[in-house]
Amino acid sequence: MMDESLVELATYLKNKLGNKLEETVFAFGELTIVARLDAITDVLMFVRDDSHCQFINLTDISGVDYPSRDKRFDVSYQLLSPRENLRLRVKVRTDENTPVASACTVYPGAEWYERETYDMYGILFSGHPDLRRILTDYGFEGYPLRKDFPVTGFVECRYDNEAKRVIYEPVVLRQEMRNFDFLSPWEGGQYVLPCDGKEDEKK
């Protein structure tokens, strides 16, 4: 059942922010508002400062990749209002080449979150004070959480005793990629389990 306070908040935000929002979504007892790309800073500043909102805590920023969409990336901001005891998710959609305005001017703690999102997805943030990789190794190529990034990666690194240093080599698979069947009987699958033949002997 949806919390009545979230329904009231959604109505309030739609009235106050108007066309700065593309949509509001209720799912799993949570409220998500989708902001226009060019209005993300205004939206974040409003929900932080407005007396009915007070979402002063930014708890996370993350990316989501939808390769089939023109704007393939969602940038998701998780916010908390300690005074109202409410959580809010703000999303914005973008593509590989269009930067999102940095939230650092609104939430100073956004700096490392945006660096992580850039490192994992390649999402660009305009106005960021230090947009460089933070999790992957020096010289890493590609963005590992994109759906089109290979599971094995492109190179593997190891310490070479002879060279006395870390070296990078093309990935060599010790066995072929295997496709596991994770279907289990209680999920409704209809298939015969292998047996040792003892049941047939009893018949």
Swiss-Prot record:
GO molecular function terms noted in the UniProt entry: NADH dehydrogenase (ubiquinone) activity; NADH:ubiquinone reductase (non-electrogenic) activity; quinone binding
Membrane association type: Peripheral membrane protein
Keyword Iron assigned: no
Reaction(s) catalysed by this chain's protein: a quinone + NADH + 5 H(+)(in) = a quinol + NAD(+) + 4 H(+)(out)
GO CC, one annotated term: plasma membrane
N-terminal signal peptide: none
Location of this chain's protein in the cell: Cell inner membrane
PROSITE patterns in UniProt: COMPLEX1_30K
Listed Pfam families: Complex1_30kDa
InterPro entries the record matches: NADH_DH_suC (IPR010218), NADH_quin_OxRdtase_su_C/D-like (IPR037232), NADH_UbQ_OxRdtase_30kDa_su (IPR001268), NADH_UbQ_OxRdtase_CS (IPR020396)
Superkingdom of origin: Bacteria
Keywords assigned by UniProt, alphabetized: Cell inner membrane, Cell membrane, Membrane, NAD, Quinone, Translocase, Transport, Ubiquinone
Subunit composition and interactions: NDH-1 is composed of 14 different subunits. Subunits NuoB, C, D, E, F, and G constitute the peripheral sector of the complex.
HAMAP family, sorted: NDH1_NuoC (MF_01357)
Known function: NDH-1 shuttles electrons from NADH, via FMN and iron-sulfur (Fe-S) centers, to quinones in the respiratory chain. The immediate electron acceptor for the enzyme in this species is believed to be ubiquinone. Couples the redox reaction to proton translocation (for every two electrons transferred, four hydrogen ions are translocated across the cytoplasmic membrane), and thus conserves the redox energy in a proton gradient.
Recorded family membership: Belongs to the complex I 30 kDa subunit family.
Protein name as catalogued: NADH-quinone oxidoreductase subunit C
